[in-house]
């Protein structure tokens, strides 16, 4: 069995076959944040909830190491569609779990023609009151 076949067997998201998106969740949940960041284009952008854009693989890796140590993502279903310039938009819904809460999430990915993540936005799907209770104090 090839590693791609093994990945598909172990980590599936209904409607999604893009390896970079599957690997994003696999490496994120394994705490392999350097590997997660390596899935991004050199100038890739991550937009986490309550944060400004984080630009570049190094900055994304630093952010993930600081903020995602105890978070598990449970993607459920997704859809992919071709955009202009050979890019692909992938939307995935699921849950994110911390030690103290679980929240519904929408992950939006834009993949470039090399199938690297050029942009991802993580959007919490919760009521305004739920979101206020989740916001970290700075």
Regions found by a protein language model. Name each.
Residues 29, 54, 92:
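Short glycine/serine/threonine-biased micro-segments
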Residues 24, 36-37, 44, 56, ...:
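Hydrophobic pocket/interface hotspot
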Residues 1-30, 34, 38, 137-138:
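Short, low-complexity N-terminal intrinsically disordered segments enriched in polar/charged residues
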Residues 7, 45-54, 67-70:
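A short gly/proline-enriched turn/hairpin at secondary-structure junctions
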Residues 18, 22, 58-61, 65:
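Generic alpha-helical structural signal
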Residues 2-9, 61-138:
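A beta-strand edge to alpha-helix "cap/lid" segment located at domain peripheries
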């Amino acid at each position: 069995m090839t590693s791609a076949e093994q990945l598909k067997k172990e980590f599936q998201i209904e409607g999604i076959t893009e390896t970079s998106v599957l690997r994003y969740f696999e490496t994120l949940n394994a705490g392999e944040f350097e590997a997660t960041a390596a899935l991004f284009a050199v100038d890739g952008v991550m937009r986490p909830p309550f944060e400004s854009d984080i630009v570049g693989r190094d900055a994304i890796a630093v952010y993930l190491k600081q903020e995602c140590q105890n978070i598990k993502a449970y993607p459920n279903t997704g859809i992919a569609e071709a955009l202009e310039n050979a890019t692909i938009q992938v939307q995935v819904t699921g849950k994110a779990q911390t030690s103290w809460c679980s929240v519904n999430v929408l992950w939006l990915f834009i993949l470039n023609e090399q199938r690297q993540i050029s942009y991802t936005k993580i959007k919490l799907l919760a009521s305004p009151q739920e979101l206020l209770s989740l916001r970290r104090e700075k």
